[in-house]
């Protein structure tokens, strides 16, 4: 019973802390962008500034497992909330753009640590029979914060120090909630003898999971950066082309929880294969977009939803197989493969649209989904052989 109470308390702390932190962060991001623009910084400069967040995430990802071993998951989680709060205070105390750049980079590293440790904690604390649904609910909540943060900024306004005060208050609430994590969460004093698992070790331990994460990142995150260009190429105006991003986000938010529920009841490997087959089929259907542009709306919804569902299935699978520092290690590599998919999709898709406007997009993403299916099936076959050999 004490273990169940501790797990429930851990879930409440992880959900509430992450909710307040991300609402604050997604309010802070457009606030900084608008403030820099008002101060005369050009679009390219603002773009480079924004990229510092992703650079911070990319750099901290391979270090997350080591940090969790050194500090323990509980204090790593707390640190990932405290650093953005300190950075937000720094934005108020100084106007120097180079200081803002440093602070935003550090905030990006903290958000990457929160992403990895937070999802690992949720997967670890969730009861096994409900793990898929709880992980899916957590990721749906994260998607909702993308919309709430900018919405709060619209209500508060962008002038003066008031919006920064609201951001600081939200981040402080997140830190306070993180302190509620139970002391039974692993500290830095136990399991430290377990060696850190590098990228190769994690890939060998769960290749099918990492393959699913990579394909999910391509279709959920990667396509987001390409959708406005795709919309313009099939005749949409600027507003409609931009709205495709919202539709993709809605698809992702809507399908993550059902995907988690399916993961609780059925074989997760088979679900991942079915999702990848559906991505392959929908990519083939995109060949009709030049003639029937209206198909973009359901297709984009499906791509965002299936990509997010693949990532959910992958995280649930890791939560079922690993615990403690080992889970943080594998979650970090899953985030790396997911992010890599998100990074590769926009430039590759842009090249395809430039050089073959009518069929290039379809050919590229059909090829990606097909290769993803082959990788997934091959990884599952190797894992089955390994399990048979171990038996």
Predicted regions, residues:
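Helix-loop boundary and gating motifs at the non-cytosolic
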Residues: 5-54, 209-212, 220-230, 234, ...
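Helix-to-loop junctions at the C-terminal end of transmembrane segments
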Residues: 60-72, 157, 255-267, 353
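Structural signature of the two symmetry-related core transmembrane helices
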Residues: 76-89, 270-284, 366
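Cytoplasmic helix-loop-helix junction between adjacent transmembrane helices
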Residues: 105-140
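Intracellular juxtamembrane helix-capping segments at the cytosolic ends
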Residues: 113-126, 308-322
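Symmetry-related core transmembrane helices of the 12-TM Major Facilitator Superfamily/SLC fold
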Residues: 164-180, 362-377
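C-terminal transmembrane helical hairpin of 12-TM major facilitator-type secondary transporters
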Residues: 269-311
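A late C-terminal transmembrane helix in Major Facilitator Superfamily
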Residues: 325-353
């Amino acid at each position: 019973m004490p273990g169940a109470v501790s797990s429930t308390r851990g879930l409440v702390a992880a959900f509430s802390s992450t909710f307040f932190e991300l609402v604050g962060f997604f309010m802070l991001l457009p606030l900084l962008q608008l403030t820099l623009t008002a101060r005369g910084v050009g679009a390219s400069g603002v773009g480079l500034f924004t990229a510092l967040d992703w650079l911070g995430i990319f750099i901290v990802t391979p270090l997350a497992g080591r940090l969790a071993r050194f500090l323990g998951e509980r204090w790593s989680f707390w640190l990932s909330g405290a650093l953005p709060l300190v950075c937000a205070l720094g934005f108020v105390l100084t106007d120097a753009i180079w200081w803002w750049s440093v602070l935003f980079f550090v905030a990006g590293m903290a958000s990457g640590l929160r992403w990895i440790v937070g999802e690992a904690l949720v997967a670890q604390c969730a009861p096994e029979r409900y793990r898929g649904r709880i992980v899916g609910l957590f990721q749906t909540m994260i998607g909702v914060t993308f919309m709430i943060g900018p919405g709060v900024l619209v209500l508060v306004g962008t002038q003066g120090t008031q919006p920064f005060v609201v951001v600081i208050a939200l981040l402080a609430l997140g830190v306070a909630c993180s302190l509620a994590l139970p002391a039974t969460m692993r500290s830095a004093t136990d399991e430290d003898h377990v060696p850190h698992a590098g990228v190769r070790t994690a890939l060998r331990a769960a290749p099918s999971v990492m393959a699913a994460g990579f394909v999910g990142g391509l279709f959920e995150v990667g396509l987001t950066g390409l959708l406005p260009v795709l919309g313009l190429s099939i005749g949409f105006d600027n507003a409609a082309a931009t709205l495709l991003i919202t539709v993709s986000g809605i698809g992702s938010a809507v399908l993550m929880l059902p995907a988690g529920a399916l993961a609780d009841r059925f074989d997760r490997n088979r679900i991942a294969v079915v999702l990848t087959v559906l991505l392959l089929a929908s990519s083939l259907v995109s060949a009709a977009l030049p003639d029937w542009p209206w198909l973009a709306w359901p297709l984009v919804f499906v791509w965002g939803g299936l990509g997010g569902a693949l990532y959910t299935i992958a995280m649930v699978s890791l939560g079922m197989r690993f615990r403690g520092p080992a889970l943080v290690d594998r979650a970090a590599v899953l985030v790396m493969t997911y992010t890599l998919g998100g990074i590769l999709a926009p430039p590759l898709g842009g090249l395809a649209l430039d050089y073959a406007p009518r069929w290039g997009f379809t050919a590229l993403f059909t090829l990606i989904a097909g290769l993803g299916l082959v990788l997934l099936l091959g990884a599952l076959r190797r894992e089955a052989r390994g399990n048979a050999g171990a038996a």
